[in-house]
Amino acid sequence: MSKKPYRIAVIPGDGIGKEVMPEGIRVIEAAAKKHGVAVQFDHFDFSSYDYYEKHGQMMPDDWKTQIGSHDAIYFGAVGWPAKIADHVSLWGSLIKFRREFDQYVNLRPVRLMPGVPCPLANRKPGDIDFWVVRENTEGEYSSVGGRMFPDTDREFVTQQTVMTRTGVDRILKFAFELAQSRPKKHLTSATKSNGISITMPYWDERVEAMARNYPGVKWDKYHIDILTANFVLHPDWFDVVVGSNLFGDILSDLGPACTGTIGIAPSGNINPERNFPSVFEPVHGSAPDIAGQGIANPIGMIWSGAMMLEHLGEKTAAQSIVGAIERTLAERTLRTRDLGGNADTEACGKAVAEMVD
């Protein structure tokens, strides 16, 4: 066993987050037991509509005190649009985590798994395997801007992109380091400097400057419009793709869609220096339309758990989970309905746990 247990803050959140979270924990516990990793799960009920309904806010005032000393945050999903506006639930929880815990890296794998039908022609497992690195705390999603003269002919709105040298350089450093660690050693930058004439040329300048520190990494850049086309036409070209907050947001959803489904995609909102806990969550969201039916696919939650273990330094345990996911997806009867199987959420989660080696 590790010297002391990793303390994980568990926040199921809304909708199917509450259903897939137990399966994620089940698989982590299976991997932890086999690989001598000690894990302690602490459960929290905030960052959910249920909490908002009772307290009028998404999280308690002392939320940072409650979870700030944990090693990581394992997050299910947030949002219930029929009951609470998305901007209220998101900005009242996940955005706070990202900004106040300085989770400046959003990291998502794009990988075609066995048993998952690919919408792209003539693609098989192994053909699509890359990472999208998204700047997560500034860029186009700043709060700088405003609205004036509402409901008049003079009405206008503005929202400014914010790029700082510190912010741009640190995300590029993370991306180049990741590319350097991979066999292909190839980085692609998303830009639009032919149309966005101030911030994007600056981004390009910083990419070129950072590249000089990594002579062993090949790099290129594409404008975001053609880059999205190449994700579909030539996904095998890519290894590590880095983009600003907006461009990274677009690409990190498009990439998993090219592998057949975003329903199994994981993600990490990461503070690489570990000054604060990082958040690991599935991409799929709260899915109110299927919540409560026990049919949600738990793979995204489970895969996010593997990313969390790798972030904590438990690479062998993490790899054992990813391998178990691959073996489970290869068996049609063990897949959930969205992937053509007939397993429910619990059965799929148990299958992955049993296949952990």
Predicted regions and their residues:
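Glycine-rich phosphate/diphosphate-binding loop of Rossmann-like nucleotide-binding domains
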Residues: 9-26, 31-32, 152-224, 237
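Buried hydrophobic positions in well-ordered alpha/beta secondary-structure cores of metabolic enzymes
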Residues: 14-17, 71, 133, 175, ...
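Buried hydrophobic packing segments
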Residues: 24, 28, 207, 301-309, ...
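N-terminal beta-loop-helix "entrance" segment that forms/cooperates
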Residues: 36-60, 231
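N-terminal glycine-rich phosphate/adenylate-binding segment common to multiple enzyme folds
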Residues: 51-158, 246
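Glycine-rich phosphate/nucleotide-binding loop
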Residues: 52, 230-333
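Short acidic loop-to-helix transition motifs that present clustered carboxylates
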Residues: 115, 222-229
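Glycine-rich phosphate/pyrophosphate-binding loop and the adjoining helix
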Residues: 137, 143-189, 193-196, 315, ...
